[in-house]
Structures are given as structure tokens and as C-alpha cells.
């Protein structure tokens, strides 16, 4: 059913065969043309003194990985790592370096918000992480310089209340910093933080969550808020914080590990008809519910995927599958093509479920969502994008999805892996 948030899904479900028109020969030209469109739309690059002012050349470096050109650099890096695009690898990496170097200059000149120095998706930590990846992919030994700056940010986010708005969520808080470290560990095949650093960050997250839950008299052990709101979803909420604690659970004391699992089960109990409200205690309105990566089942699914991969308990996989069913029904979102609250973000749930189950039904569903992105219905009925190049709201994240659709055994939501 068509609603104000989503298009009606009129596709037939899986009947035993994948779409013939979604092979490499068909999709690769779409990827290439979309990349070229993104690169043509990029704003002028600056950095340093040129970055002053919202309309200056350096404004392109604002917004971090989420909406700035740093996110485009990551997309180009991601494409360069695919054997399917080996011929363009060097060009894409060189372009990525140019973009991320502008962002590095903006960071080094102090033109960015001091509160986002250690932010993964909105600030410095993400810039340094992607610079490390791009430099390393180019074979440059000086990749250790941005890596060293990333490591140094551990001291910034170690104090329990280092941000007034909330110190623990994914975009600007400690969960994001741990997530960035996880990405670097995966791509560099080495742990980039010391055990002492990891334990310090995890302990700060735990202490913060315990203190908040006690202060607010919650009937569960860990809770957090961001700008005063008790979010549950992946963008700013409990689910991604718990996901990061599970990702580093070997660094937790057994008693704290138990608190994390209790909180995971508490969140599972908050499910309302295959979905979760944006904030704790809300009742979902079925005709107006959010089915986004940022708020709702398509993002919370990743926590339960991680819980399943660690524990092998079927209730966690069953929860992921229910998330996928709702996403199939309501995931053709009108907000655009992106991964935060768009069609590609919905489709990534199917690629996740394929990796968890091996069921080709989920590749088919992802193919259908990819197909829908290029229909006139979507183009005319979706929201006009503020930035077509944004990694999270625009087409850069969509490119990552299309690449991953061609290599589903390695597919994972950008910068948010549960398989590390």
C-alpha cells in the first residue's frame, strides 16, 4: 500500500529464480554512470583558510562521512576494492585521495566543530579513518599519519561525559569511534587500538549507560539519550551502542557482558509488529511508522544479526527475518535512494539476511529494490535530494549497494559491519 512514507511494493516475491537483468553486464554501467554523475556534482574543494564560512570552498568538507565529500571518498575506495572495477581502481583511488586530503586540511586548520573531533560519521574520526584506508590502498607508507591521529582521538572520547548532547551514540559518540576502529581492523587486517584503549572506551560506554539507567530508574541495566531523547535505532540509539559492545565483548568483564546481553534481550522485547519506535516508550502508528536504517527495523536488524553470529541463538535470527519481512513490505521509501532513510538502506537488510541464511530469496528482493531505484515512479515520486553525492542520503551509498549486490557474499552495510 502506498503511504506518505513509502511506495507500494507491487513486485511478486521470489519464485525460485533471480532477475536475469541484474547481472554484472547490466549493473556495472549503471554504477559507472552514477559515479560520474556524482563526481560532476561535487562542490569546489578547499581546506584550511579557504574552508571558512558555510558557502566557502571548504563547506564541502562539512558533514563528515554522512553528507560531506569524505563520504564520496569512501564510496570511491569501496568501488576500487571490487575486482569488477579493477580497470578504474587507480583513478578512483586518486580521486578519493584528492577529496580526503581536502577534508584533512579542514581538520588540521581547525575549521571543523571542536565537538566533532572524535565523531565517526560527522567529524574527524571518520575523516582520519577513511584517509587511512585510501592511503593504505594506494600503497603509501604515510597512511600511518592519519591512523595515528585517529588513535589519538581515543583520549578525547574516554571521559564519560565528553559531549553534552550524549557521548555514546554512533554519529558523534563513542559507539561511532569503536565502529571506525572496527572498520580499520577489518580493512587493514590488524587491531588499530590497544586492548587498554578498547577497554577504556567500552568501560566509559558501560558506566554512562549504567548511570543513566539508574538516574532514570529504568527496569533494565543500560540506557542512553541523545539531546535528551532515548533513541532505540541505529543512528543515535541503543541498538548500535549495544552492537559495538558486542563487537568488542571479549574486552568486557563477564558481569558487564551479561548486562549487555540483558539489554539486547530488553530491546528485542520492545518490538511492535516487526518494528521498533524511534524512542523508548512510543507506540507505533502503523500507517505512519518509520521503517528506516536510522530509525526502525532496517537498522536494528544489525544488532540482532551480531547477537546471532555470536550466540547462534535462533531467536535473534528470527528477529532479523521479521525485520526483513517488514522491510519488503514498507522499504520502498520516498525519502530517496540513500542508505540512511532510503531504498538502498532498506535493500541492505536483504543482503544481510542472505549472508546470514544463504537463502537466494533475499538476493532477489535486493534486486527488485535496485530495479525500483531506476523507475519513473521512484524518480518522480521521491523527495528531491539536497545533495546527490551524500554517502548516507544521496547516491554514493546507492553505489556501494549496487557494488555489493554484484558480490553478495561480501556485502555489508557501509562502515557498519557485523562480520568482524
Swiss-Prot record:
Gene3D superfamilies: 1.50.10.10. GO terms for biological process: carbohydrate metabolic process; peptide modification. It comes from the Eukaryota. InterPro entries: 6hp_glycosidase-like_sf, LANC-like, LanC-like_prot_euk. Transmembrane segments: none annotated. Belongs to the LanC-like protein family. PANTHER family: LANC-LIKE PROTEIN, LANC-LIKE PROTEIN 3. This is LanC-like protein 3. It comes from Mus musculus (Mouse).
